[in-house]
Structures are given as structure tokens and as C-alpha cells.
UniProtKB/Swiss-Prot annotation:
Comp. bias intervals (Basic and acidic residues): 196-207
Protein name as annotated: Protein IQ-DOMAIN 21
Annotated PROSITE patterns: IQ
Stretches the record annotates as Disordered: 1-35, 54-76, 196-221, 295-316, 416-471
Localization in the cell: Nucleus; Cytoplasm, Cytoskeleton; Cell membrane
Task of the protein: May be involved in cooperative interactions with calmodulins or calmodulin-like proteins. Recruits calmodulin proteins to microtubules, thus being a potential scaffold in cellular signaling and trafficking. Involved in abscisic acid (ABA)-mediated signaling pathways leading to the production of hydrogen peroxide H(2)O(2) and the subsequent [Ca(2+)] cytoplasmic oscillations-dependent regulation of stomatal closure. Required for [CO(2)] modulation of the cytosolic Ca(2+) transient rate and for high CO(2)-induced stomatal closing. Essential for both cold and ABA induction of XERO2.
This protein's GO CC annotations: cytoplasm; cytoskeleton; nucleus; plasma membrane
MF terms (GO), sorted A to Z: calmodulin binding
Record's compositionally biased regions (Pro residues): 305-316
Entry keywords, A to Z: Abscisic acid signaling pathway, Calmodulin-binding, Cell membrane, Cytoplasm, Cytoskeleton, Membrane, Nucleus, Repeat, Stress response
Residue ranges of every copy of the IQ domain listed in the record: 119-147, 148-170
Species for this entry: Arabidopsis thaliana (Mouse-ear cress)
């Protein structure tokens, strides 16, 4: 589209159709120049052009045409028709111009939105920098506030955690003390009950062992009330007590052995038997120590010892009872027999064998005398029927001593005889008969002159206890 007043199609049509006067042409030129200036000014300032700037009624061409038509004289009909056609064409051109103006205004409006002036750009830049500065300052302030809150909250949380831990420690400490107090009370109650049971059991059942008490105590109880430490201490004390008792018994056996050995040595010297003096006594001590260490001590307990106030006597070699000595006269007659013509040294060995057999029982006799009254005679110490018959056959020369364990020397026969339960001394047939079905301590001197006999060769028929003397 061309500019108005610059030689467009509308001006060309108007010049050809209407030939205006010079005044009209000057006016039209002024109007066109004014319109061009207005358009240029609008384009430079980039203002939005509205449709109000181009009203259809105020068009200069239309007003000029109307004035020209009004001023023209209507002289002839042809001119009128021609004027009507020109008016119609002018109206159509005006409408086309209005449409073009509207399109141009729309284009200007759309182009003006995307374009900015330098002032607007500078203002926008200044505002953006200022707003960025404000945002950065707010961010720094926010960061400082967050750090301060973190520090304050961290200290507060730390203090709160420390306070909580202290409270928990105090609570645990109180619970521990309460539990310890309960355990102490339960322990004292159990200890008192245990002592009462021990006293009651010691008064009612003095011969009852610690094993039975232990089985009675093993009833359903609370496990935390059982004091294992006190039980272990009690067991250790009882074990030490039993060991001390064993040592005392051993010392008494040593002393009694030494005393009997000295008496036997003096008797041999008075009769004229061979004696070695102190060497023989020392040899007897060594032999007794060796024999006692080789024998199993069944009295030592591997389990818990006896309870307080109770005493279990250690087992000793059993005495030959009446049932053992009166089994059969044939058996007692088949024991080892020795001729009267036995040498004196062999007789001394036999006497020593009998002595040591009763020396080993010295400790038991001492404990037995403490427990039994002196007037009471047990059944195993009573003389048997065979012993009474042999004493009756022997005559009044030998006196039966049922309660004596000590061997005595018969000066008339020059033979050592022992009278007591389980030991028969007879002169009938010139033989010394000894019956010991129980275990005995071997004689160290007589071991060289006798050897064990197998069960098939044993003349007594007792198996391993049979001994054959080689003359």
C-alpha cells in the first residue's frame, strides 16, 4: 500500500474523473502532507494507532467530492449520471481505504508490542539488577538465620540428650540397687533357712550323710536364691576337715606303730631273739608309710563333705565276724599249719604279722571307743562257738580274752599268742591256727618266705587269700 498523497491509485482515479481547481489541489496537497506527517510521527513514536484516527465521515476526499457535487450545476442528465457513478466509485474507494487503514493499524499495533525503547530497556536492566541485589541480600540473611537456628537447636538438643542420659543412668542405678537389695534379702532368708535345716537335721538325724541332705535340698526352688559360693566354701571346708582328720589318724597310727614296735623289740631282746635295733625300727616306719600310701583311702570323699555338726567315720578294714569264723570247722582246720619245730626267727615273723594286723586297727579302736560306751561289747567281739570249744579242749592254761586286741607273750610255751575275735590260738597238734577272712596288711619279713598260691593249689580253698609257707 502506498502512502496517502504520494500518487496512489485513489489520487489517479480522482484526477482522471474530477479535475479540480488549483485551490482544491493545494488543499488536497496540504491534507496529504499533513496525513504523511502524522503517519511519520506515529511510526517514529511507535504509538498504537486506533481506528478512531480514520473516521469514515471525516474523510477529506469524500467531503471534497460532496462539496464538488453540490457545487456543480445539474445542467444536464448525463452529468448527473456520471456524478452518481463517480460517487459510487468514491464510496467503494473509501471503504477500501478504511479497510486498508484498519489493517495497517493492526500491523503497527502488533509491531509496537515487540519493540522497546532504550529508556525502557535501561529501566528494565536497572530494575533487574536492583531486584537481584535484594534477592541476594535476603538469601544471605536467610542463611545466617538458618545457621543461628542450627546452632541454637544443636546446643538445645545436646543439652536435652545429656539430661536424658543422666536420668536414664540414675534410673538404672536405682534399679540395680533395688535388685541387689532384693537378692541380699533373699540370700539372707535362704541362708537362715539353710542353717535351720542343718541344725534340725543334725539334731534329728545325726548319722545322716551330706549326700542325703543334698538330695533333700534339691527341691524346686528359685535359682537366684541359691548361693553357690557358700556351698563351695562349705564343701572346701569339709574337705579340708576330712583331710586333717585323715592326717591325724595317720599320725596316731604312726605313733602307735612305733610304740608297739618298741615293745616288741624289748620283748625279743628279753627272750633272746634277733633284733637289729634302731635300723629295724626305721625300716618298720618306711614299710608302714609305703603300705599306707599304696592302700586306697576310701574315706576321702570326692563329692561334698559332711554337713556341719556331723561326722562320718572313715572306713577301716572289717573285723572278722562270728559268721566268718564259724563258717565250718573243716575250713578253720584247713588253714595254714606250722610245725612246732619251726625256727625261732620264723616264729618272730609270725608274731610280727599278728602284731601289725592289730596295729592297723589301732586308729579304729580309738575312734570306736570314743563313740561306744566301755560297757557295751559288740557282737563281732564275742567269742565264737569253735573258739570256745578249742579253749575248752585246751584246758585252763590259756585264758580267753574276748575284749582284748593286744597280743601277749606266753613264757611257758615261748610262742606269741593272740586271743580275740577272729583269732584262735591252740596248742593241740603243736600248730598255731590263725583265721583271718578279712583283709590284712602283709608282713614285710614274711613275704620273702611265702608266696601266693593259685586258687587251684590253695589248700584252704579261699582263692587269692591262700598263702603257702615254704619251710
Amino acid at each position: 500500500m502506498g502512502k496517502k498523497g504520494s500518487g496512489g491509485w485513489f489520487s489517479t482515479v480522482k484526477k482522471k474523473v474530477f479535475k479540480s481547481s488549483p485551490k482544491d489541489s493545494k488543499r488536497e496537497n496540504n491534507i496529504g502532507s499533513n496525513n504523511a506527517d502524522i503517519w511519520q510521527q506515529q511510526h517514529d513514536t511507535q504509538e498504537v494507532v486506533s481506528f478512531e484516527h480514520f473516521p469514515a465521515e471525516s474523510s477529506p476526499e469524500i467531503s471534497h467530492d460532496v462539496e464538488s457535487t453540490a457545487s456543480t450545476p445539474a445542467t444536464n442528465v448525463g452529468d448527473r449520471k456520471h456524478a452518481m457513478a463517480v460517487a459510487i466509485a468514491t464510496a467503494a474507494a473509501a471503504e477500501a481505504a478504511v479497510a486498508a487503514a484498519q489493517a495497517a493499524a493492526k500491523v503497527v499495533r502488533l509491531a509496537g508490542y515487540n519493540r522497546q525503547t532504550e529508556e525502557d530497556s535501561a529501566a528494565v536492566l536497572i530494575q533487574s539488577h536492583y531486584r537481584g541485589y535484594l534477592a541476594r541480600r535476603a538469601l544471605r540473611a536467610l542463611k545466617g538465620l538458618v545457621r543461628l537456628q542450627a546452632l541454637v537447636r544443636g546446643n538445645h538438643v545436646r543439652k536435652q540428650a545429656q539430661m536424658t542420659m543422666k536420668c536414664m543412668q540414675a534410673l538404672v542405678r536405682v534399679q540395680g540397687r533395688v535388685r541387689a537389695r532384693r537378692l541380699q534379702v533373699a540370700h539372707d532368708r535362704f541362708k537362715k533357712q539353710f542353717e535351720e535345716e542343718e541344725k534340725r537335721s543334725g539334731m534329728e538325724k545325726p548319722n545322716k550323710g551330706f549326700a542325703n541332705l543334698k538330695t533333700e535340698r534339691e527341691k524346686p526352688k528359685k535359682l537366684h536364691e541359691v548361693n553357690r559360693t557358700s556351698l563351695y566354701q562349705t564343701q572346701g571346708k569339709e574337705k579340708e576337715r576330712s583331710e586333717g582328720m585323715m592326717k591325724r589318724e595317720r599320725a596316731l597310727a604312726y605313733a602307735y606303730t612305733y610304740q608297739r614296735q618298741m615293745q616288741h623289740t624289748n620283748s625279743e631282746e628279753g627272750i633272746g631273739l634277733s633284733s637289729n635295733g634302731p635300723d629295724r625300727n626305721q625300716w618298720a616306719w618306711n614299710w608302714l608309710d609305703h603300705w599306707m600310701s599304696s592302700q586306697p583311702y576310701t574315706g576321702r570323699q570326692t563329692g561334698p563333705g559332711p554337713g556341719p555338726g556331723q561326722y562320718n567315720p572313715p572306713p577301716y578294714p572289717p573285723f572278722p565276724t562270728a559268721a566268718a569264723t564259724t563258717t565250718s570247722d573243716d575250713v578253720s582246720e584247713k588253714t595254714v599249719e606250722m610245725d612246732v619245730t619251726t625256727p625261732t626267727s620264723l616264729k618272730g615273723n609270725i608274731i610280727g604279722l599278728i602284731d601289725r594286723e592289730y596295729i592297723d586297727l589301732g586308729s579304729y579302736r580309738q575312734g570306736h571307743k570314743q563313740r561306744k560306751s566301755p560297757t557295751h561289747i559288740p557282737s563281732y567281739m564275742a567269742p565264737t562257738a569253735s573258739a570256745k570249744a578249742k579253749v575248752r579242749d585246751q584246758g585252763p592254761t590259756v585264758k580267753l580274752q574276748g575284749t582284748s586286741f593286744m597280743p601277749y607273750w606266753n613264757s611257758s610255751t615261748k610262742n606269741g599268742s593272740v586271743n580275740g575275735s577272729g583269732c584262735d590260738s591252740s596248742s593241740s597238734g603243736g600248730a598255731i591256727t590263725t583265721g583271718y577272712p578279712g583283709p590284712r596288711s602283709p608282713n614285710p619279713k614274711s613275704d620273702i618266705r611265702r608266696k601266693p598260691v593259685s586258687p587251684s593249689q590253695s589248700p584252704t580253698g579261699f582263692g587269692k587269700r591262700g598263702w603257702r609257707h615254704d619251710h
